[in-house]
Every structure is written in structure tokens, then in C-alpha cells.
Regions:
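N-terminal Rossmann-like NAD(P) cofactor-binding subdomain of oxidoreductases
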Residues: 1-204, 208-210, 231-236, 310-313
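Conserved active-site and cofactor/substrate-binding residues in soluble primary-metabolism enzymes
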Residues: 14, 130, 154-161, 210-218, ...
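Short, well-ordered loop/turn and helix-capping segments at boundaries between secondary-structure elements
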Residues: 25, 225, 341-345
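Short, solvent-exposed polar/charged micro-motifs at secondary-structure junctions
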Residues: 42-44, 70-71, 188-189, 251-255, ...
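Short beta-strand or tight-loop elements
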Residues: 131, 239, 303-305
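Short Gly/Pro-enriched turn/cap motifs at secondary-structure boundaries
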Residues: 207-211, 248-249, 296-299
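C-terminal substrate-binding/catalytic lobe of Rossmann-fold NAD(P)-dependent dehydrogenases
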Residues: 211-289
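C-terminal active-site/capping subdomain that shapes the small-molecule cofactor and substrate pocket
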Residues: 256-352
Length: 352
């Protein structure tokens, strides 16, 4: 059986490590190069002892010619604004890319500059429009033919999947949407930070970036596209959301609670039906029937997005609860799901 050759750039971050764990056991993948500027020259098992006797692979510095020549597809799991200088060169060499940063998620380069504070060259502006947003449950057909996939953020994945069916079917008002999300500490990455020290996080629960989180424009862009249609000029006005992230004293997992105003009276059976129909071909979405609701512990360690809801008739609201593993469906698992689709493999290959 012929395998596709894969390299991972940024293989020693949390998402990069999860990619390696999945890919080393993927039956259709040959893991060629693991790139890490911080640990080049060391064996990955020296950095993560869990790979001892499982994977014998030396970490290397990035070399465009070496990586592109040996790879069919490359994952870039790098900090935001870093991938944008590297991805165009890989694409020029004929290599497909799944980028886990935010660098190619935002279609409007002015919005990208506003939120990420990076100037764009002309090539990058063009790639913003060419990149496919890698949410398979919505963009499956586009991902199949994509050369560059922008892997969604963790919070946006939980939110967009959670409420897309309601917006698509106009069951809710596109205004006044409130999103309350909680994430485990790994969502902040491996970099050192006082606020992420054990003594700061343990036995604590706090909100952060309560007005301006970088995932807001991504969520608004995709919800607007779902509601108004990708080609509808009305989406320029756009859906606005009030988003508040929180940090949980756990390693991984996200739980999002979204509050939306119903358009008229809706029964649970009606809402359940649109969710089941919308995701009936989505292998990694699990719909909970009321009164059951998702919990983080059900989703952690899987590539599933679990979705449940409750209708508060007294105030005319629907509350949607979704849960994912931020490092899997929110990062590495979804990236491999996209790789599978781009390569013509079953979506679930290597993930179940």
C-alpha cells in the first residue's frame, strides 16, 4: 500500500506533539521530517519520553528544499504570524499544506491586520482568498480539492459547529449572540507564562481577553457565511458576537455555552431534527438528545464535537452546549481529518 509522505513543522508544541502521536500510527502515512527550531538535533523521545521505543525520529531545523522534496503534505503547527512567511514557499514547491495557525483563516486581509498586527505581502493576500477554511462538516467538498487548508481555531470549532444549524435554518436571530467558553490550560500553548503556572491556575477559574480575543473575527466570519450565504453581500454587515473565554484548571478540553434568541416558538423535536439532518454525514459530530448535555470528559481524547441544547421558553432563548478536545478536534485531530479528505482517505482514518 502506497503511503503519503508527511512532515510536521512545529512538532514540539502541544498541537505538534498530538499530530506526531496520530500520524505515527496512521496506516496511510509515512512520517518523514519533524521540524523544531528549538530542539533541532535531538530525538523527539528526548523531548517527550512517551515516544521511547515507539518513534525514533531526529528533530531538524527547517530546510525548504529538504522538506518540500521529501513531502507530499506538510503540517505547519507554528505560532500565529509565523506560518505566513513559510507557507507560500512550500506551495511553490508543489507541497500541500494544512496550517494550524490563524494566518490563513481570515479572508479579509484588513481584518487580519487589525487583529494580528502583521503586514501582508501580495502573495499572502492572494492566499488568504485561496485557502479553504478547514471545517469538514461545512466545507467538505472544497477541502477535497484544496492545496492550502486553514485549520480552524479551537474555540471557533466548538462554537461554529454548535450553532451553525440554527443559523442556517434561520431558527434564531443573527443578533445578540452571547458565547461563554471555557478551555483547559493547554490551549495557551507550551510557552512560559506566569499566568499559566500551576500555582496560578490550580484551584482557580478566570476569564481572560474578555473584549478582544483573536478568535472573534474567525467566529463572526464563519457564522455570517452560514447565515447569509458565502456569496451574499449582506454578510459584509456581518454577525457580531459577544465572546468571553475562561481558563479552567484542567489540561485539555473546551466547553462552550452559546445563548441565542429563538425566532418564534420552537419545540425540542424541531431543533433536534435540524441538528440530526445537518450533521447526518459528519462522523465526528455527536448530537445529544435533550435533556442530556455534553461534558468535557466525554470529548477529551477524541476527535468528536459533542453538541446538546436546551430551550428556555420563559425568555425565548436556546442555549447550545458543545464540547471538544482542544488539542484534537480543536487542532491536531481536525488537521488530520483535513489531510484525510485532501488525500482521498476516509475522514476517520487514523482517528478512531
Amino acid at each position: 500500500m502506497k503511503k503519503i509522505k508527511i512532515s510536521v513543522i512545529g512538532s514540539t508544541g502541544y498541537a505538534g506533539k498530538e499530530l506526531v502521536k496520530i500520524l505515527m500510527n496512521h496506516q496511510k502515512v509515512e512520517l518523514v521530517h519533524l521540524v523544531s527550531s528549538s530542539y533541532a538535533g535531538k530525538n523527539i523521545a528526548e523531548i517527550f519520553p512517551e515516544f521511547l521505543n515507539k518513534l525514533d525520529k531526529k528533530l531538524i531545523n527547517f530546510n525548504l528544499d529538504v522538506v518540500s522534496q521529501d513531502s507530499d503534505l506538510v503540517f505547519t503547527a507554528l505560532p500565529h504570524t509565523v506560518s505566513m512567511d513559510m507557507v507560500p514557499e512550500l506551495l511553490k514547491k508543489g507541497v500541500k499544506v494544512v496550517d494550524l495557525s490563524a494566518d490563513y483563516r481570515i479572508k479579509d486581509f484588513a481584518v487580519y491586520q487589525e487583529w494580528y498586527k502583521k503586514e501582508l505581502n501580495q502573495i499572502s493576500k492572494e492566499l488568504l482568498l485561496e485557502a479553504v477554511y478547514g471545517l469538514p462538516e461545512i466545507y467538505l467538498d472544497k477541502i477535497k480539492d484544496a492545496l492550502l487548508v486553514a485549520n480552524p481555531g479551537c474555540y471557533p470549532t466548538s462554537v461554529i459547529l454548535g450553532i451553525a444549524p440554527l443559523l442556517k435554518h434561520h431558527f434564531v436571530e443573527p443578533v445578540g449572540i452571547i458565547i461563554d467558553s471555557k478551555s483547559g490550560i493547554s490551549g495557551a500553548g507550551r510557552k512560559l507564562s506566569l499566568g499559566l503556572h500551576f500555582a496560578e491556575c490550580n484551584e482557580n477559574f478566570k476569564a481572560y481577553k474578555v473584549v478582544r480575543h483573536n478568535h472573534i473575527p474567525e467566529v463572526e466570519q464563519e457564522l455570517s457565511s452560514v447565515y447569509f450565504g458565502a456569496d451574499n453581500k449582506e454578510q459584509i454587515k456581518g454577525i457580531k458576537v459577544s465572546f468571553t473565554p475562561h481558563l479552567l484548571p484542567i489540561n485539555r478540553g473546551i466547553l462552550s455555552t452559546c445563548y441565542l434568541s429563538l425566532r418564534g416558538s420552537k419545540k425540542e423535536e424541531e431543533v433536534l431534527e435540524i441538528y440530526q439532518k445537518y450533521y447526518h454525514k459528519a462522523p465526528f459530530v455527536r448530537i445529544f438528545e435533550p435533556p442530556n448535555l455534553p461534558e468535557i470528559k466525554y470529548a477529551v481524547g477524541t476527535n468528536y464535537c459533542d453538541i446538546g441544547f436546551t430551550i428556555d421558553e420563559r425568555v425565548g432563548k436556546i442555549k447550545v452546549i458543545s464540547a471538544i478536545d482542544n488539542l484534537l478536534k480543536g487542532a491536531a485531530g481536525q488537521a488530520v481529518q483535513n489531510m484525510n479528505i485532501m488525500s482521498g482517505f476516509p475522514e476517520t482514518c487514523g482517528l478512531v
